[in-house]
Amino acid sequence: MKRTVVKARAFELVDDEGNVRARLGLANDDSPFLSLHDPDGRVRARFGLDASGAAGLAIGDEEGKVRATLGLATDGSSSLALGDKNGKIRAKFGLAAEGSPTLGLQHRDGETRFVFSIAQQGSPTLSLQDEDGKARARLGLAAEGSPVLRLLNKEGELRVLMGLADDGTPVLQFVKDNEPTWSASDAVEVPESEPAEGSEAAVGTEPQS
């Protein structure tokens, strides 16, 4: 049977009242999208690709506020974001391009205040951030399981470090200008326990549609 091909720039589905309920078309940059509308014409769901090819799904409520987004970037990173009734994103979950997961919780003003991530080698890190979005405290485990707590100032500089060395020796250091000014155990070295590169960025990536 011969196939029939219909070509157009856009398609619209309407209800019995003539209201558009679904639209398939191209955005101004020729990116394809599919949008679903409620009886009042508000977009409740939209799926599409941006100019780079990244895919995104956005779901809105009856007030037109986006409440959930799901996206996949061209570098392989993905993200899920959940918003409140004011359209402010309050929780984000994402995977960096190399697969490191990150969970971020945000204040109602939109600033990220809590980040939990797992590095590529499996080390977990908990980050607490201030109203400017800067990390002020980090608690994590190194690859071999040694715990590390870092306290940072408003500029993001390390000031206090507490942890256990590989052999279980407790360590406490006061730091200024990245140099220890006082240490309770200066003969041992605390293992690194920083978030994986790009892990926090992944959770902040908004799906494009």
Where are these regions (language model features)?
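Parallel beta-helix/beta-solenoid repeats that form elongated, surface-exposed shafts/blades used
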Residues: 1-194
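Long, low-complexity, intrinsically disordered segments
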Residues: 196-209
